[in-house]
Amino acid sequence: MSSHTRTQRLSVPQLVAMKGRQKIVSLTAYTSHMARLMDPFVDFILIGDSTAMVGYGRTSTLDMSLAEIIAHTRAVVAGSRLACVIADMPFGSYQESPQQAYRNCAEVMARTGCAALKLEGGRALAPTVEFLVQRGIPVMAHIGLMPQFVNQMGGFKAQGLDSEAARKIEEDARAHLEAGAFSLLLEGVAEPLARRISDFSPMPTIGIGASPACDGQVLVTEDLLGLGGPQVPRFVKQYADAGALISQACERFAAEVREQAFPQLQHCYGVVQEA
């Protein structure tokens, strides 16, 4: 279903039904303004815990609170009208137990109006996914390169490059599908592995640094716009240099203020215009 033909917000079942029919498009957002701009063109908007890095300048996604996710998700829901809205659950908000996960996931959904939640974890997380799904919370399972496991993985490294690592990720995928996840997000995994998972999965796979064979693709919007900083992941394609445009606009503003070219009377209130 093309976003250009929709008149209502895309639902999770409609997103699932796109598998095998149309590629799914997603970008990240954490403000209402950005959500409004991308809304006509994407199928779902992801409020990623990557906001900790691209929005707040932190060194990892681990330093993202539940309150921050709720605030940013509320903004994205308010700024969008057509796209399905999916929020990341932050580190430490769901790993302790299925009960903890349900309390926090239910709070995010109730307070924001988002349609689903994304959780990172391998097959050990599958019982939690099943617990949530059985209680009405749609879950997108994030496997492969999992930024919340950055300390355990030793950095942001591609996953599934050897047969044993690939086998474990494939087992993660099957466990989450059996648990009832409506989608799999595959990040930074070997292309043949992502292709294989996409082939056997009855649910949509969303790739980021994975494979063209995935049912959909997502990117961090700041990377797409050239705002992600000097170190850009290999899987990113930059579609615009918004950073240069912003710098140019700031430079022009500063120059005009210092040269007393701005503001002019036309920018002021209560000015009597000469006849």
From Swiss-Prot:
What keywords are annotated for this sequence in UniProt? Cytoplasm, Magnesium, Metal-binding, Pantothenate biosynthesis, Transferase
Q: Where are the transmembrane segments?
A: none
| Record GO terms (molecular function) | 3-methyl-2-oxobutanoate hydroxymethyltransferase activity; magnesium ion binding
What's the Enzyme Commission number for this chain?
2.1.2.11
* Active-site residues, record numbering mapped to chain: 187
Task: Kindly state which reaction or reactions the protein catalyses.
Answer: 3-methyl-2-oxobutanoate + (6R)-5,10-methylene-5,6,7,8-tetrahydrofolate + H2O = 2-dehydropantoate + (6S)-5,6,7,8-tetrahydrofolate
GO cellular component terms attached to this protein's record: cytoplasm
Please give the pathway this protein is involved in.
Cofactor biosynthesis; (R)-pantothenate biosynthesis; (R)-pantoate from 3-methyl-2-oxobutanoate: step 1/2
Gene Ontology annotations of biological process type = pantothenate biosynthetic process
Cite the binding residues for Mg(2+). 49, 88, 120
Report the locations given in the UniProt record: Cytoplasm
Which residues does the annotation say bind 3-methyl-2-oxobutanoate? 49-50, 88, 118
Q: Which cofactors, by name? A: Mg(2+)
Q: How is the cofactor bound?
A: Binds 1 Mg(2+) ion per subunit.
One Pfam family recorded for the sequence: Pantoate_transf
Q: Which InterPro entries match?
A: Pantoate_hydroxy_MeTrfase, Pyrv/PenolPyrv_kinase-like_dom, Pyrv_kinase-like_dom_sf
Q: What quaternary arrangement does the UniProt entry report? A: Homodecamer; pentamer of dimers.
Q: What does this protein do?
A: Catalyzes the reversible reaction in which hydroxymethyl group from 5,10-methylenetetrahydrofolate is transferred onto alpha-ketoisovalerate to form ketopantoate.
The family this protein is said to belong to? Belongs to the PanB family.
Q: Which PANTHER family match?
A: 3-METHYL-2-OXOBUTANOATE HYDROXYMETHYLTRANSFERASE (PTHR20881:SF0)
Q: What is this protein called?
A: 3-methyl-2-oxobutanoate hydroxymethyltransferase 1
Q: What organism is this sequence from?
A: Pseudomonas fluorescens (strain ATCC BAA-477 / NRRL B-23932 / Pf-5)
Taxonomy, top ranks, is: Bacteria, Pseudomonadati, Pseudomonadota, Gammaproteobacteria, Pseudomonadales
